[in-house]
A protein has these predicted regions:
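A feature for loop-to-transmembrane-helix boundaries and adjacent hydrophobic helices
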Residues: 1-306
C-alpha cells in the first residue's frame, strides 16, 4: 500500500536504451561517465602539483579495472546468496550483472594505483590527494545509475522526496516482507550523491586554503565518507550480510571512520612533507607554490605594462 504522500520521486520509466543491437544500461553508462570525469579532474589536479600527466594515464589503466574487479568481489562476498546466486568461475568479472561494493573497489584500486606510482618513482601521497575529490565526484555520478536500477533505497517514507520503487524492484532487493506493501522509500542513493559532491568541494577548498600534509585529503575522504555510510547503513533495508544484528557495512564504516581520523592526525603531526625537487602543494590558480613564487609578474616580464 502506498504511503500517504502528495509528492514523490517517480520510478524511472526505463533503465537503458538501444544503440543498434546493443542495449546500453544507464547504470553502466553512469559508471563510465563518472570514471572519465574522475580521470579528467585528477589529471588537472596532478598537473597542478607538477605531476606528469602520462603517469596518471598509466595509473588509471591499471587501477580502474582493479577497482571494478575489487568492488565486484566485495559485493559477491558480502551479499547474501538469496540475492546474488553463486556465479560461475567468471562471477567476479561479471560486472554486467550489476553490483559493486565501494570498499572493495577503493582498496583494490588504491593498492594497484600506489604500486604503479611507486614503480614510476613518484610521490604516491601527492597522487592520493589529487584523486580524493575526484573519487567522490565519480561516486556521485555512479549513484545516478542506482536510481535507474531502483536500488540502494532506504526505509519506507511519507516525505515528499520519497522514491517510488516498482514491485519487481522491491522483490529483487530482498527487503523485509513487512515493507513490501509500501511503494515510496528513502532515496538513500540521492542523499549520498549530495554528500559526495559536498565533501568533494570541502576537500578541494582545504587543499587550496589549508596546509594539509599529503595524503591528508585522502585520509579525510576515508573518514568523511565512512562517517556518512554509518548514517546510510541505518536506513538501508535491502538485503545485506549482518553481524550482531546490524548490517556488516555498518561496522566497516565505523572502522573506516576511526581509521581515517587516526590516519589524518598521524599524517599532520608526523607525516613527511614532499621531498625537495618533488611537486609542492597546489595553490589557487592551478600552479604549484614553487612555480607561483618563481613566476615573474606581468609588469616585470612586460615593461610596457607598467
Amino acid at each position: 500500500m502506498p504511503l500517504a504522500v502528495d509528492m514523490h520521486i517517480p520510478s524511472p520509466p526505463v533503465n537503458g536504451f538501444h544503440v543498434g543491437p546493443l542495449f546500453v544500461h544507464f547504470y553502466g553508462l553512469m559508471y563510465v561517465v563518472g570514471i572519465a570525469l574522475a580521470i579528467y579532474i585528477t589529471r588537472r589536479r596532478w598537473r597542478a602539483v607538477g605531476g606528469d600527466p602520462s603517469l596518471l594515464t598509466d595509473v588509471a589503466t591499471w587501477a580502474v579495472p582493479a577497482g571494478i574487479i575489487g568492488g565486484r568481489i566485495y559485493f559477491d562476498i558480502t551479499t547474501p546468496f538469496d540475492i546474488v546466486p553463486k556465479h560461475a568461475w567468471y562471477g567476479p568479472l561479471a560486472v554486467w550483472d550489476g553490483g559493486l561494493g565501494i570498499w572493495g573497489g577503493i582498496l583494490a584500486g588504491a593498492a594497484v594505483g600506489i604500486w604503479r606510482v611507486h614503480r614510476a618513482g613518484a610521490d604516491w601521497r601527492l597522487m592520493a590527494d589529487a584523486v580524493a575529490p575526484a573519487l567522490l565526484v565519480a561516486q556521485a555520478i555512479g549513484r545516478v545509475g542506482n536510481y535507474f536500477n531502483q536500488e540502494l533505497f532506504g526505509k519506507p517514507t511519507a516525505l515528499p522526496w520519497g522514491l517510488e520503487i516498482s514491485r519487481a524492484a522491491r522483490l529483487g532487493s530482498g527487503i523485509p516482507a513487512a515493507d513490501m506493501k509500501y511503494t515510496t522509500f528513502q532515496p538513500s542513493f540521492l542523499y549520498e550523491l549530495i554528500f559526495d559532491l559536498a565533501l568533494a568541494a570541502v576537500l578541494v577548498w582545504l587543499g587550496h586554503h589549508r596546509n594539509i600534509r599529503p595524503p591528508g585529503l585522502l585520509a579525510l575522504y576515508v573518514a568523511g565518507y565512512s562517517a556518512y555510510r554509518i548514517f546510510e547503513e541505518t536506513i538501508r533495508i535491502d538485503s545485506s550480510a549482518h553481524f550482531l544484528g546490524l548490517r556488516l557495512n555498518f561496522f566497516i564504516a565505523c572502522v573506516g571512520t576511526a581509521a581515517g581520523i587516526a590516519w589524518f592526525v598521524f599524517v599532520q603531526r608526523r607525516g613527511k612533507v614532499p621531498e625537495p625537487g618533488r611537486p609542492a602543494s597546489p595553490v589557487p590558480g592551478g600552479v604549484t607554490e614553487a612555480a607561483a613564487a618563481a613566476e615573474p609578474s606581468a609588469a616585470e616580464s612586460n615593461p610596457a605594462a607598467s
